[in-house]
């Protein structure tokens, strides 16, 4: 995610994905790693939510996407640094809407301060503050590393979907999710509401990146033989079964 020779969220790459989306009638594209702060990953996670990296021209990306009829989906990864996010949240959401971006994915891939858990009163109050702030800015939310769904989308319909599951990403750095995992989700996790599992990986053996010198080991669970335990047909089926209005 950080800006180096492996940086993915660049203006050039963004246009490639926008072109692909337009050609395949995909309505929106999400870009992660576009903003300054990823170089602090593993530390205090001091992200700046209104300062793009030098190789990501957000004005040009949004202009190009609009020209192609594609929505840009925003991204706020907090790393669990709640005080840092809350200081910037209102301004950052307004900044997005000023750029014509009205859908936002949030992330909390890290520990909350002072040992607070995601489901603590501190965490629940924060998540509610995000939903209400987004509503004021007429933004739709997709929360990753969220608290469990309790039906608040009936009151706050901008809370469109959330992760809250061992999702697709686990296949990239571990033994992966077993085939039985997807069979259980509709009868367990999905009882509470929409599930943003992020299905749709067609390179199930990671052949495009497996031997790339640019590939980087993520953690100790990555043994170098990660793959998606699925078939192409199942990936298509997951889009239908694992409901997420995003």
Question: Regions from the language model: what does each represent?
Answer:
Residues 1-24:
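An acidic-aromatic substrate-binding cleft motif
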Residues 5-9, 118, 225, 229:
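Conserved aromatic-histidine-acidic binding/catalytic patches
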Residues 32-222:
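Aromatic- and carboxylate-enriched substrate-binding clefts and catalytic-loop regions
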Residues 212-246:
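Glycine-rich, aromatic-lined ligand/substrate-binding cores of catalytic
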């Amino acid at each position: 995610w950080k800006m180096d020779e492996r940086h993915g969220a660049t203006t050039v790459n963004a246009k490639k994905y926008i072109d692909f989306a337009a050609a395949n009638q995909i309505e929106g594209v999400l870009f992660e790693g576009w903003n300054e702060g990823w170089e602090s990953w593993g530390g205090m996670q001091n992200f700046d939510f209104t300062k793009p990296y030098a190789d990501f021209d957000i004005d040009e990306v949004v202009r190009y996407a609009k020209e192609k009829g594609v929505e840009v989906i925003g991204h706020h990864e907090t790393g669990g640094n709640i005080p840092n996010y809350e200081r910037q949240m209102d301004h950052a959401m307004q900044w997005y809407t000023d750029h014509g971006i009205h859908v936002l994915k949030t992330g909390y891939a890290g520990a909350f301060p002072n040992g607070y858990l995601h489901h603590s009163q501190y965490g629940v109050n924060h998540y509610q503050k995000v939903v209400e702030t987004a509503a004021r800015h007429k933004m739709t939310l997709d929360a990753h590393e969220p608290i469990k769904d309790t039906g608040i989308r009936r009151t706050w319909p901008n809370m469109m979907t959330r992760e809250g599951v061992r999702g697709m990403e686990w296949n990239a750095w571990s033994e992966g999710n077993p085939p039985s995992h997807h069979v259980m989700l509709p009868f367990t996790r999905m009882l509470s509401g929409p599930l943003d599992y992020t299905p749709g990986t067609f390179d199930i053996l990671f052949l495009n990146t497996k031997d790339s010198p640019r590939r980087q080991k993520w953690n100790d669970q990555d043994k170098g033989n990660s793959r998606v335990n699925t078939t192409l047909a199942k990936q298509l089926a997951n889009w239908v079964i694992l409901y997420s209005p995003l």
